Amino acid sequence: LVELAEKQQRLLSIFHNRRWDGDFLTVRRLLAEGALGQVAQFESHFDRYRPEVRQRWREAGGPGSGLWFDLGPHILDQSLQLFGQPDWLQADLGKQRPGALADDYFHVVLGYGEMRVILHGSCLVSAVMPRFVVHGSQGSFIKFGMDVQEEQLKEGKRPPAADWGVDPAPGQLSQIRDGQLVQQTVAGEAGDYGAYYRGVCAAIRGEGENPVPADEALAVMALLDLARESDQQGRRLPCQKLSD
């Protein structure tokens, strides 16, 4: 597709819509502001309680099936947006539900020097778990709940509704100031999937950059495959640049 787009002189853009999740935008802003200092640990969770295996292709065990290929692209892309290419990764993929044919659990660790990025997903988590947990040299941020845009669409809402993308659950920011722990709630940024389409429109018109160029999607695909290889080999694997 990349070669065809170049040959036909067309724009090729990938729908990594979760770059515009409200909770992710909030985390991105806090990191850009240096609110947590030097990040030491970043956790991104997609935990669910779906104990029954359903009859659908995502759970049938064929090519492209499984929780890692379903949710991994989203949280890998978000991690790459924040921190760039990792030095190494180690993955553990599992089939935990009775009768599961495709992986329904993943725990993937990305190494960036001494910093660790943890990507975790499961279908057997009944407790309310945080979506993001970030620890740094000057504080921590914890955010519960999922971005609301998908549910709003299912309810028939459309932008520009007044509450579009507005997350009702604030995050918890804990900072060390003058040696004292200070805690406060942080209202989330409004999610905005429409920003992707506006970006594509601007790129087609020559008025802006491609919001998600193909090479960024290829980097995600390479890490998805590398994680499967890591799981199969049971060891940490180095991450090479896509050009390598």
Task: Describe the residue ranges of each PLM region.
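Aromatic/hydrophobic pocket-lining residues that form π-stacking "cages" and hydrophobic walls in ligand
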Residues: 1, 27, 223-227
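Catalytic-core regions built around general acid/base machinery
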Residues: 1-7
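Predominantly a Rossmann-like dinucleotide-binding segment in NAD(P)-dependent oxidoreductases
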Residues: 8-13, 18-99, 107, 234
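A structural signal for well-ordered alpha-helical scaffolds and beta->alpha junctions
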Residues: 20, 24, 72-79, 144, ...
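A short acidic, glycine-rich active-site loop
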Residues: 63-69, 160-166, 186-187
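Contiguous beta-strand/loop segments that form the cofactor/metal-binding neighborhood of enzyme cores
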Residues: 77-161, 187, 194-209, 225, ...
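C-terminal helical cap and adjacent loop that interface with cofactors, partners, or active-site loops
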Residues: 165-244
